């Protein structure tokens, strides 16, 4: 089966193919869901996008990085216009400065994979807003304020029931509604199983004007940002502080990773239809939470470089989130092959991987192409091939998170990303500054070629037919896009 023989194989203006007659329903307007809707539209599929939220907030969330592997997909949208729009909202630094608790600098290291024409670091809400608006220019049917209450599937198609009783039918459903979404439960028949890491992240986004009451303090990170943004990271035993500016110092993002300081027994048990706050709580900010975060660095000599920014943060822009690890899933596709989960619903990564958004975009692109190549009569085959390709990477990334997570998952590409992350945790939270002084580059963020230079779209076009033939013959197909250590 080749692209020339499939219904949607002829490429038109702006890379959008002729109609495939495949009706796709996407659940979730996060990064993965929007990417799925856009990529499916570009591959000729008819798309409906639904989400329970009433509107998209461009100021929601903190910061996110999209690496080269995700950005190369976005760069094709709108003849490059979407890529250029994102660039105008990004952090344009090319360096990351490493410091210890005393504020001593251990040099600046190249921030690979996120520079101009390679990737971006920006506010998460701004990115979602840009993608949402672009989906609108394509004429994609977007239905906000539409909670999904039920999923249905037969051998011939899938459907969702919205609150109020409306039923939307499709040839397939792409679920990108998160780890606690109903789509994941329908596909896997499993409740999310998590493992405690003992760590939490306080994270926030704020604007330069929020700092005015504290301008008399040493806000060093703003120095020189009228010309170029900055990123600074402080490491100490048991804590890490990251800060970076956006749009030449007009906005700031900060993240403090620390030991869990919330008594989980005091959190309320879940009510019907809600997630367990004691499992994966994300608490909205308060003044007391800001004070608690500041207390994490109370004895740091460099506290005056950090505290003004933390104390200036509007509480509503602060989130405190427990870091957990999860076992990789064995299945992303529903029994009849008409539903697939992507993004966090399929593979919630530990934050340190820095690949959550990029991998969700890759998921979306692969599913859209697989549907294009398989055609309307072979939708289940398309989703199972997409699962085969993408789960390899995701398992590697998930298992990378912590040494405490020992898994025997069968998806080596994803497994490798998590292993790498656990090594980073060791370096970050148990730094040997004598060793770092001799070789500061050991704390530089990694940029493995197998990950950042991977072209997920080209890979599907090259390998789809081989995988389809192997499945038809009952042979095991060995995925080629695995990391060197897998």
UniProtKB/Swiss-Prot annotation:
Which domain of life does the protein's organism represent?
A: Eukaryota
Which GO BP annotation is one of this protein's?
Answer: biosynthetic process
- What residues sit in the active site? 203
Enzyme class, one word? oxidoreductase
UniProt lists the family membership as follows: Belongs to the paxM FAD-dependent monooxygenase family.
Q: What is this protein called?
A: Flavin-dependent monooxygenase pboD
Transmembrane portions of the chain: none
What the entry lists under Pfam families is as follows:
FAD_binding_2, FAD_binding_3
Binding of FAD occurs at: 51, 65, 124, 344, 357
Free-text disruption phenotype from the record: Blocks the production of protubonine B and leads to the accumulation of cyclo-L-Trp-L-Le.
Enzyme Commission code: 1.14.13.-
This chain's function reads: Flavin-dependent monooxygenase; part of the gene cluster that mediates the biosynthesis of protubonine B, a hydroxylated and diacetylated cyclo-L-Trp-L-Leu derivative. PboD is also able to accept other cyclodipeptides (CDPs) as substrates, including cyclo-L-Trp-L-Trp, cyclo-L-Trp-L-Tyr, cyclo-L-Trp-L-Phe, cyclo-L-Trp-L-Met, cyclo-L-Trp-L-Ala, cyclo-L-Trp-L-Pro and cyclo-L-Trp-Gly.
Which pathway, metabolic or otherwise, does it act in?
Secondary metabolite biosynthesis
**Single annotated GO MF:** FAD binding
Tell me which UniProt keywords the record has, alphabetically: FAD, Flavoprotein, Monooxygenase, NAD, NADP, Oxidoreductase
- The species is Aspergillus ustus
The coenzyme or cofactor needed here is: FAD
Which residues belong to the signal peptide in this entry?
A: none
């Amino acid at each position: 089966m080749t692209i020339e023989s499939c219904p949607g194989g002829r490429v038109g203006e702006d890379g959008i193919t002729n109609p495939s007659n495949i009706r796709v329903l996407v659940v979730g307007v996060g990064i993965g869901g929007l990417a799925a809707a856009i990529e499916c539209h570009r591959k000729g599929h008819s798309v409906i996008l639904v989400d329970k939220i009433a509107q998209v907030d461009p100021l929601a969330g903190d910061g996110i990085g999209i690496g080269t592997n995700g950005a190369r997909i976005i760069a094709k949208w709108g003849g490059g216009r979407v890529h250029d729009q994102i660039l105008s909202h990004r952090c344009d630094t090319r360096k990351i400065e490493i410091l210890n608790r005393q504020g001593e600098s251990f040099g600046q290291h190249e921030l690979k994979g996120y520079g101009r024409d390679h990737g971006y670091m920006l506010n998460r809400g701004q990115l979602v807003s840009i993608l949402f608006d672009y989906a609108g220019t394509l004429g994609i049917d977007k239905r906000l304020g539409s909670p999904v209450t039920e999923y249905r599937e037969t051998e011939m198609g899938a459907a969702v029931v919205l609150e109020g009783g409306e039923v939307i039918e499709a040839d397939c459903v792409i679920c990108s509604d998160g780890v606690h979404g109903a789509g994941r439960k329908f596909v896997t028949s499993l409740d999310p199983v998590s493992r405690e890491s003992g760590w939490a992240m306080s994270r926030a986004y704020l604007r330069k004007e929020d700092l005015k009451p504290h301008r008399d303090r040493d806000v060093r990170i703003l120095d020189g940002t009228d010309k170029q943004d900055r990123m600074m990271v402080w490491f100490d035993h048991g804590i890490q502080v990251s800060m970076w500016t956006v749009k030449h110092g007009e906005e700031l993002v900060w993240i403090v990773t620390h030991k869990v300081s919330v008594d989980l027994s005091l959190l309320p048990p879940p009510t019907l239809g809600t997630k367990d706050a004691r499992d994966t709580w994300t608490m909205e900010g308060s003044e007391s939470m800001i004070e608690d975060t500041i207390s994490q660095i109370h004895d740091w000599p460099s506290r005056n470089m950090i505290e003004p920014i933390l104390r200036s943060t509007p509480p509503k822009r602060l989130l405190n989130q427990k870091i957990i690890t999860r076992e990789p899933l064995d299945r992303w596709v529903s029994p009849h092959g008409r539903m697939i989960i992507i993004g966090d619903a399929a593979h919630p990564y530990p934050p340190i991987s820095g690949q959550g958004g990029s991998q969700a975009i890759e998921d979306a692109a692969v599913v859209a192409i697989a549907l294009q190549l398989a055609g309307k009569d072979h939708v289940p085959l398309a989703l199972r091939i997409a699962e085969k390709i993408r789960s390899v990477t995701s398992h590697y990334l998930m298992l990378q998170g912590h040494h405490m997570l020992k898994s025997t998952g069968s998806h080596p590409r994803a497994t490798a990303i998590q292993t790498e992350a656990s090594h980073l945790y060791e370096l970050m939270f148990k730094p040997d500054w004598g060793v770092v002084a001799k070789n500061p580059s050991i704390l530089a963020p990694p940029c493995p070629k197998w990950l950042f230079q991977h072209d997920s779209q080209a890979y599907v076009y090259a390998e789809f037919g081989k995988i389809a033939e192997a499945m038809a013959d009952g042979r095991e197909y060995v995925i080629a896009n695995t990391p060197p250590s897998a």
